[in-house]
Amino acid sequence: QSWFARQALSGGILPGIGTHSLDAILWWLGEQAESVYAMVQNIDPHPEVDIEDEVSLVATTPSGALINVAFSFHHSLGYEWSVAGTEGTIHLSGTQGVLKLNGEVREVPERVELPGEDSIQHEFLSAVAEGRPLAQASGRDTRATMALVFAAQESGRTGQKMEVVHG
Protein backbone atom coordinates (compact mmCIF):
# COMPACT_ATOMS: atom_id res chain seq x y z
CA GLN A 1 0.00 0.00 0.00
CA SER A 2 1.10 3.53 -0.67
CA TRP A 3 2.78 5.69 1.99
CA PHE A 4 -0.02 8.15 1.30
CA ALA A 5 -2.55 5.81 2.92
CA ARG A 6 -0.85 6.13 6.32
CA GLN A 7 -1.68 9.07 8.60
CA ALA A 8 1.77 9.08 10.19
CA LEU A 9 3.49 9.37 6.80
CA SER A 10 1.22 11.65 4.76
CA GLY A 11 -0.92 13.52 7.28
CA GLY A 12 -4.08 12.57 5.39
CA ILE A 13 -6.08 13.93 2.48
CA LEU A 14 -5.95 17.60 3.54
CA PRO A 15 -2.16 18.02 3.77
CA GLY A 16 -1.54 15.64 0.88
CA ILE A 17 -4.05 16.88 -1.69
CA GLY A 18 -6.16 19.61 -0.12
CA THR A 19 -3.31 22.07 0.30
CA HIS A 20 -3.11 22.71 -3.44
CA SER A 21 -6.76 23.66 -3.82
CA LEU A 22 -6.90 25.61 -0.57
CA ASP A 23 -3.74 27.52 -1.48
CA ALA A 24 -5.24 28.49 -4.85
CA ILE A 25 -8.49 29.62 -3.23
CA LEU A 26 -6.74 31.77 -0.63
CA TRP A 27 -4.56 33.26 -3.38
CA TRP A 28 -7.64 34.09 -5.50
CA LEU A 29 -9.34 35.72 -2.54
CA GLY A 30 -6.22 37.56 -1.44
CA GLU A 31 -6.88 36.88 2.22
CA GLN A 32 -6.51 34.26 4.93
CA ALA A 33 -9.16 32.00 6.41
CA GLU A 34 -10.54 33.08 9.76
CA SER A 35 -12.55 30.03 10.88
CA VAL A 36 -13.34 26.55 9.60
CA TYR A 37 -15.74 23.69 10.22
CA ALA A 38 -14.83 20.32 8.73
CA MET A 39 -16.38 16.88 8.57
CA VAL A 40 -14.16 13.89 7.83
CA GLN A 41 -15.07 10.26 7.18
CA ASN A 42 -13.58 7.01 6.08
CA ILE A 43 -16.49 5.55 4.13
CA ASP A 44 -14.51 2.70 2.59
CA PRO A 45 -12.22 1.41 5.36
CA HIS A 46 -9.33 -0.91 4.61
CA PRO A 47 -6.90 -2.39 7.15
CA GLU A 48 -3.90 -0.83 5.38
CA VAL A 49 -5.50 2.64 5.11
CA ASP A 50 -5.78 4.81 8.21
CA ILE A 51 -6.54 8.20 6.64
CA GLU A 52 -9.91 9.76 5.93
CA ASP A 53 -11.20 9.32 2.38
CA GLU A 54 -13.83 12.08 2.46
CA VAL A 55 -13.44 15.65 3.75
CA SER A 56 -15.90 18.51 3.50
CA LEU A 57 -15.16 21.92 4.94
CA VAL A 58 -16.57 25.42 5.16
CA ALA A 59 -14.24 28.30 6.00
CA THR A 60 -14.79 32.03 6.41
CA THR A 61 -12.54 35.01 5.67
CA PRO A 62 -12.42 38.46 7.28
CA SER A 63 -14.30 39.97 4.30
CA GLY A 64 -17.13 37.48 4.80
CA ALA A 65 -16.32 35.18 1.88
CA LEU A 66 -17.36 31.55 2.35
CA ILE A 67 -15.07 28.78 1.14
CA ASN A 68 -16.84 25.46 0.62
CA VAL A 69 -14.64 22.55 -0.44
CA ALA A 70 -15.02 18.78 -0.67
CA PHE A 71 -12.19 16.30 -1.20
CA SER A 72 -12.91 12.68 -2.05
CA PHE A 73 -11.04 9.56 -3.07
CA HIS A 74 -14.29 8.06 -4.39
CA HIS A 75 -15.07 9.95 -7.55
CA SER A 76 -13.42 10.37 -10.90
CA LEU A 77 -14.99 13.67 -11.85
CA GLY A 78 -11.75 15.62 -11.66
CA TYR A 79 -11.79 19.21 -10.51
CA GLU A 80 -14.88 21.38 -10.39
CA TRP A 81 -14.46 25.02 -9.38
CA SER A 82 -17.24 27.53 -8.78
CA VAL A 83 -16.76 31.11 -7.67
CA ALA A 84 -19.89 33.07 -6.81
CA GLY A 85 -19.30 36.80 -6.60
CA THR A 86 -21.18 40.07 -6.62
CA GLU A 87 -21.25 40.17 -10.44
CA GLY A 88 -22.09 36.54 -11.15
CA THR A 89 -20.77 33.01 -10.97
CA ILE A 90 -17.87 31.39 -12.77
CA HIS A 91 -17.79 27.61 -13.04
CA LEU A 92 -14.76 25.75 -14.34
CA SER A 93 -15.15 22.05 -15.03
CA GLY A 94 -12.21 19.69 -15.00
CA THR A 95 -9.00 20.33 -16.87
CA GLN A 96 -10.60 20.65 -20.30
CA GLY A 97 -11.35 24.35 -20.04
CA VAL A 98 -15.15 24.32 -19.91
CA LEU A 99 -16.00 27.67 -18.40
CA LYS A 100 -19.46 28.98 -17.56
CA LEU A 101 -20.12 32.60 -16.67
CA ASN A 102 -23.60 33.07 -15.21
CA GLY A 103 -24.68 29.79 -16.80
CA GLU A 104 -23.45 30.68 -20.30
CA VAL A 105 -20.71 28.40 -21.66
CA ARG A 106 -17.64 30.35 -22.73
CA GLU A 107 -14.71 29.07 -24.72
CA VAL A 108 -11.34 29.15 -23.07
CA PRO A 109 -8.98 30.36 -25.81
CA GLU A 110 -6.03 28.18 -24.87
CA ARG A 111 -5.03 25.52 -22.43
CA VAL A 112 -2.78 26.79 -19.67
CA GLU A 113 0.04 24.48 -18.67
CA LEU A 114 0.92 24.69 -15.00
CA PRO A 115 4.59 24.50 -14.09
CA GLY A 116 5.88 21.13 -13.00
CA GLU A 117 8.09 20.31 -10.03
CA ASP A 118 11.32 20.96 -11.93
CA SER A 119 10.37 24.53 -12.82
CA ILE A 120 9.14 25.21 -9.29
CA GLN A 121 12.41 23.97 -7.81
CA HIS A 122 14.40 25.96 -10.40
CA GLU A 123 12.47 29.13 -9.52
CA PHE A 124 13.10 28.61 -5.81
CA LEU A 125 16.83 27.99 -6.22
CA SER A 126 17.21 30.93 -8.64
CA ALA A 127 15.42 33.29 -6.25
CA VAL A 128 17.65 32.23 -3.36
CA ALA A 129 20.83 32.51 -5.46
CA GLU A 130 19.84 35.94 -6.81
CA GLY A 131 18.52 37.26 -3.50
CA ARG A 132 15.13 38.12 -4.95
CA PRO A 133 11.58 37.32 -3.84
CA LEU A 134 9.83 34.24 -5.15
CA ALA A 135 7.64 34.76 -8.20
CA GLN A 136 4.33 33.66 -6.67
CA ALA A 137 4.00 31.82 -3.38
CA SER A 138 5.76 32.85 -0.22
CA GLY A 139 6.33 31.25 3.15
CA ARG A 140 3.55 33.49 4.46
CA ASP A 141 1.16 32.03 1.85
CA THR A 142 2.15 28.48 2.76
CA ARG A 143 1.76 29.20 6.45
CA ALA A 144 -1.77 30.57 5.90
CA THR A 145 -2.73 27.46 3.93
CA MET A 146 -1.29 25.09 6.53
CA ALA A 147 -2.98 27.01 9.37
CA LEU A 148 -6.29 26.37 7.58
CA VAL A 149 -5.42 22.69 7.04
CA PHE A 150 -4.46 22.12 10.69
CA ALA A 151 -7.58 23.91 11.96
CA ALA A 152 -9.75 21.84 9.57
CA GLN A 153 -8.14 18.61 10.81
CA GLU A 154 -8.81 19.63 14.42
CA SER A 155 -12.40 20.51 13.53
CA GLY A 156 -12.81 17.11 11.88
CA ARG A 157 -11.53 15.40 15.04
CA THR A 158 -13.61 17.44 17.51
CA GLY A 159 -16.73 18.23 15.49
CA GLN A 160 -16.35 21.90 16.46
CA LYS A 161 -15.89 25.07 14.43
CA MET A 162 -12.27 26.18 14.85
CA GLU A 163 -10.54 29.53 14.68
CA VAL A 164 -7.69 29.51 12.17
CA VAL A 165 -4.64 30.64 14.14
CA HIS A 166 -2.07 32.63 12.17
CA GLY A 167 1.25 33.68 13.56
Predicted regions and their residues:
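NAD(P)-dinucleotide binding in Rossmann-like oxidoreductases
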Residues: 40-54, 60-122, 166
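C-terminal helix-rich "cap/oligomerization" subdomain common to oxidoreductases
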Residues: 126-167
